[in-house]
């Protein structure tokens, strides 16, 4: 026991005699030099002691020196010089540089080593003391701080920047914060790739998004961050950096909820980041932001944009009718492979179809066909069908009709012919429609209808011939079916003939007309100028027995029936129809609600009208001006039992405006 205790006491007393405790007392082993320091002791672990390496010795000695600095900082003359009690004391450039370097060393050691004096952000007296000195220096001499900051080494700059940012934020030094961020970004831009890798850790900090930076600094942050990832494309981007990019690219005034993004501890590749940013730009209609991101990618020499980002960019330009920039992009050879995507095709066709400029559409398709695509016949048919649909959606019916006849005959197909018939129906070319359907569609349609007038029309001189389509080779699609029913109603314009045709189709086992076409025939009978009430009621009764076939068909029939009874003031049958409609009230629009209200108000059933109006408010239908004018006809006394239905402030404003 004495052999163990006496050497231990001797080492402890020798350690206490040292004025500066640069080396803490070793545990379980007394050594005479650092080279004899072992990591594992034989008596404790049962293993042979391993000699410490040179790196471990360097870390040990450096950590010990920082511990001595921490333990004696209050007695140091440098810190004594700038105590709060010493009025008028100002730090020099060398003093400030010394503090910064010492803080960065202690900060670095604390992240890798367990030191005796813990470097705690809230409890460490040294850090509290230094933060006070930094805040005092920011207040009294901010120019000196910025000068010293610009002279720091890269590693020291990376360590001291978050500390200075936190101190400046806590003391509300907004101007100093902005200038500090500017100096950091300028320093980052002037560094090489190795130095940028050291400084880049500060790009991930959340304090960027908590500082009110001007727009030029936000743009500079985005530019430098993207350029760094352009040159280091193998590195992914973490969620905090993507969140900062989102905040700086898009204004908070647009109602963004800047929630923190989470990628499940994954690094997001740059192409996915760009697709994410372009999708936000498309959603918020931010053309300038998308153009800025596109320029950054082009300047970095990264080649073509990622496909998803490019598609969103072209769709955004199409939405804003920026045809000039779209034309410049399509001429770049690097995007040729993207132009086969149907979303790109529809985006390019949208601004042209809105103007009805079918000649430009033809020239664009011709350029793609000969220089870009080399496409197959099936794909060309899809492109032309897209073009026809775009013209029809924008109600450019004459352009769509003319566009069809400019298509090469070998490209025409059933879909294109059907779209041409839709345009012809809107232009009231009903004789052409009947001839084309009778000639180029299979099934002897006109003979099966059994109307002599229709047969005579189709046997007359043909108004046109569709080259590229064989007679009798097409099948009647649902769209063509409705076009045929509409043309028959316009051409015959006879309620008796239409009623005979409707009865014939309803009694036929294999009816030519579908449900929607039957509704068109019914409306044709109801709207004929020389029709009688008996004929119309007979037509309504014919379809009333078939309404259980389909819910949508039932709603359409009851809607036509309701309109018919209200127009003829047959309120008894109107009430019966309304009872049937009340079971399906979630499935019809505001027009039917308005007819229901008209019928009730005309019968002075105001209490029922108020109940219907309450159901209208709870439904998905949107009230219009007709609804508001009908409600004003109801006496206000009937709204007492429904206080929530009284005219709100918005309704009063609308009524006063009307």
Curated annotation (Swiss-Prot):
Keywords: Mitochondrion, Repeat, Transit peptide. GO terms for cellular component: mitochondrial matrix; mitochondrion. The keyword Transmembrane does not apply. Disulfide bonds: none annotated. It is found in: Mitochondrion. The keyword Transit peptide applies. GO terms for biological process: mitochondrial gene expression; mitochondrial mRNA processing. PPR repeats lie at residues 130-164, 220-254. Disruption phenotype: Impairs growth on galactose, leads to low viability on glucose containing G418, and leads to strongly sensitivity to antimycin A on glucose medium. Residues 1-29 form a transit peptide. This is Pentatricopeptide repeat-containing protein 7, mitochondrial. It comes from Schizosaccharomyces pombe (strain 972 / ATCC 24843).
């Amino acid at each position: 026991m004495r052999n163990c205790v006496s050497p231990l006491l001797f080492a402890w007393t020798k350690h206490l005699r040292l004025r500066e405790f640069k080396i803490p007392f070793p545990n379980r082993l007394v050594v005479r030099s650092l080279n004899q320091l072992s990591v594992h002791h034989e008596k404790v672990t049962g293993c042979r002691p391993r000699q410490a390496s040179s790196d471990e010795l360097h870390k040990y000695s450096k950590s010990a020196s920082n511990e001595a600095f921490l333990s004696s900082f209050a007695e140091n003359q440098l810190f004594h010089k700038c105590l709060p009690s010493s009025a008028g004391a100002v730090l020099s450039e060398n003093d400030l540089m010394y503090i910064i370097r010492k803080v960065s060393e202690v900060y670095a050691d604390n992240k890798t080593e367990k030191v005796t004096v813990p470097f705690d952000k809230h409890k460490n007296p040294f850090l509290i003391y230094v933060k006070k000195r930094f805040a005092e220096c920011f207040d009294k001499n901010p120019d000196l701080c910025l000068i010293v900051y610009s002279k720091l080494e890269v590693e020291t700059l990376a360590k001291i920047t978050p500390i200075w940012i936190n101190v400046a934020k806590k003391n509300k030094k907004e101007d100093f914060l902005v200038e500090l961020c500017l100096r950091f970004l300028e320093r980052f831009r002037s560094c090489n790739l190795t130095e940028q890798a050291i400084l880049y850790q500060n790009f991930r900090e959340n304090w960027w998004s908590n500082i009110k930076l001007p727009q030029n600094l936000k743009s500079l942050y985005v530019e430098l961050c993207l350029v760094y990832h352009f040159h280091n494309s193998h590195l992914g981007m973490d969620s905090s950096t993507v969140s900062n990019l989102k905040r700086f690219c898009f204004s908070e005034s647009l109602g963004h909820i800047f929630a923190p993004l989470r990628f499940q501890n994954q690094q997001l590749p740059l192409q996915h980041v760009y697709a994410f940013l372009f999708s936000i730009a498309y959603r918020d209609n931010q053309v300038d932001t998308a153009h800025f991101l596109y320029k950054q990618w082009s300047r970095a020499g990264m080649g073509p944009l990622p496909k998803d980002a490019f598609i969103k960019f072209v769709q955004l330009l199409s939405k804003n009718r920026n045809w000039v920039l779209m034309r410049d992009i399509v001429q770049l050879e690097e995007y040729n492979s993207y132009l086969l995507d149907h979303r790109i095709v529809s985006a390019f066709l949208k601004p042209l179809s809105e103007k009805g400029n079918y000649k430009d559409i033809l020239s664009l398709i011709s350029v793609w066909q000969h220089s870009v695509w080399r496409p197959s016949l099936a794909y060309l048919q899809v492109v032309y069908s897209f073009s026809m649909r775009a013209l029809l959606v924008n109600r450019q019916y004459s352009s769509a009709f003319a566009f069809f006849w400019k298509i090469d005959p070998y490209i025409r197909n059933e879909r294109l012919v059907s779209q041409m018939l839709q345009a012809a129906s809107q232009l009231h070319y009903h004789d052409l429609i009947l001839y084309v359907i009778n000639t180029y569609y299979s099934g002897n349609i006109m003979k099966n209808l059994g109307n002599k007038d229709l047969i005579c029309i189709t046997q007359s001189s043909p108004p046109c011939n569709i080259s590229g389509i064989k007679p009798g080779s097409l099948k009647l699609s649902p769209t063509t079916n409705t076009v045929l029913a509409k043309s028959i109603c316009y051409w015959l314009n006879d309620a008796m003939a239409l009623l005979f045709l409707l009865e014939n189709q309803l009694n036929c086992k294999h009816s030519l007309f579908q449900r929607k076409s039957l509704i068109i025939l019914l409306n044709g009978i109801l709207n004929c100028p020389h029709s009688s009430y008996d004929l119309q009621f007979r037509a309504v009764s014919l379809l009333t027995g078939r309404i259980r076939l389909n819910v949508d068909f039932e709603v359409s029939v009851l809607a036509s029936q309701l309109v018919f009874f209200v127009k003829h003031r047959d309120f008894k049958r109107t009430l019966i129809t309304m009872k049937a409609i009340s079971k399906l009230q979630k499935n019809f629009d505001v027009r039917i609600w308005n007819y229901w209200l008209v019928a009730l108000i005309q019968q002075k059933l105001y209490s029922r009208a108020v109940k219907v109006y309450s159901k209208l408010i709870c439904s998905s239908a949107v009230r219009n001006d007709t609804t508001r004018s009908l409600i004003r006809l109801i006496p206000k006394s009937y709204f007492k039992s429904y206080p929530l239905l009284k005219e709100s402030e918005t309704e009063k404003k609308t009524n006063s405006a009307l």
